[in-house]
Amino acid sequence: MSVPVLRVRRLGLVGYAEALGVQGRYVRELKAGGEAGSPGGALLLCEHPAVYTVGVRRGRYPGEEEARLRGLGADFQRTDRGGLITFHGPGQLVCYPVLHLGALRRSLRSYVCGLESAVIRLCRGLGLPGERQPDTGVWVRGNKICAIGVHCARHITSHGLALNCNTDLGWFGHIVPCGIVGKGVTSLTQELGRQVTIDDIIAPFLEAFEEEFQCQLVPEQNPEQNPVQNRPDRDAGPL
């Protein structure tokens, strides 16, 4: 049985709405069957300027709440992903897998569990006790380090996960993250007691993703059309 081949594209620091547009192009490509000979999906890696996002249960966040959060200096976006409110900002690795679940031989539930497992692998490789809890995401010592919220239509996924590397956690203090009362948030930097950047984490994250989903990740093959930073060969050193 062949191993799924997925592209990796690094978008860098990009606005949330712009990243949604990029996801949409990859989703449309998969729905159309893709170009002849092209890999069947992609992982889009990025970080965002400060933005609060809410999922499909957006009724809990009226215009007054949106105005309050915008007043802090952040953007505010309403989306079609699962889950409630969360924060994205610099120092947070965001991964948007645009994949066909059939190619991965996974149900939606198994896919979400796989995202959790990949991040848990990463955390444990760093010596951190990453774990699941009844609420979706990855937790370290009772605090959420990675939020997960996905959308799936016609077996094609979008949205994904956000892993706190050296994020300013103060932004989370203005909301109830993911609607979970009484739970805190944390970051790799806070847990390890040293600065951990996105560039430090991308390579081990991609390795953990490959191991969990039994796939092959390759750099985007058209950098002139998609001017982003792609993943180097593993022997080339850290990103």
From Swiss-Prot:
A single GO BP: protein lipoylation
Main location: mitochondrion
Annotated residues for binding of substrate: 81-88, 147-149, 160-162
EC code: 2.3.1.181
Domain BPL/LPL catalytic: 37-217
Active-site residue list: 178 (acyl-thioester intermediate)
Location within or outside the cell: Mitochondrion
Region (Disordered): 220-239
Catalytic activity reported: octanoyl-[ACP] + L-lysyl-[protein] = N(6)-octanoyl-L-lysyl-[protein] + holo-[ACP] + H(+)
Pathway: Protein modification; protein lipoylation via endogenous pathway; protein N(6)-(lipoyl)lysine from octanoyl-[acyl-carrier-protein]: step 1/2
Any one GO molecular function term: ligase activity
UniProt xrefs under InterPro entries: aa-tRNA-synth_II/BPL/LPL, BPL_LPL_catalytic, Octanoyltransferase, Octanoyltransferase_CS
One Pfam assignment: LplA-B_cat
GO cellular component terms given for this protein: mitochondrion
Record bears the keyword Phosphoprotein: no
UniProt keyword Lipid biosynthesis present: no
Keywords recorded for this protein, A-Z: Acyltransferase, Ligase, Mitochondrion, Transferase, Transit peptide
Transit peptide: 1-18
Site location (Lowers pKa of active site Cys): 144
Function: Catalyzes the transfer of endogenously produced octanoic acid from octanoyl-acyl-carrier-protein (octanoyl-ACP) onto the lipoyl domains of lipoate-dependent enzymes such as the protein H of the glycine cleavage system (GCSH). Lipoyl-ACP can also act as a substrate although octanoyl-ACP is likely to be the physiological substrate.
Alphabetized NCBIfam families for the sequence: lipB, PRK14345.1
Annotated family: Belongs to the LipB family.
Additional comment: In the reaction, the free carboxyl group of octanoic acid is attached via an amide linkage to the epsilon-amino group of a specific lysine residue of lipoyl domains of lipoate-dependent enzymes.
Protein name: Octanoyl-[acyl-carrier-protein]:protein N-octanoyltransferase LIPT2, mitochondrial
Organism: Xenopus tropicalis (Western clawed frog)
Lineage: Eukaryota, Metazoa, Chordata, Craniata, Vertebrata
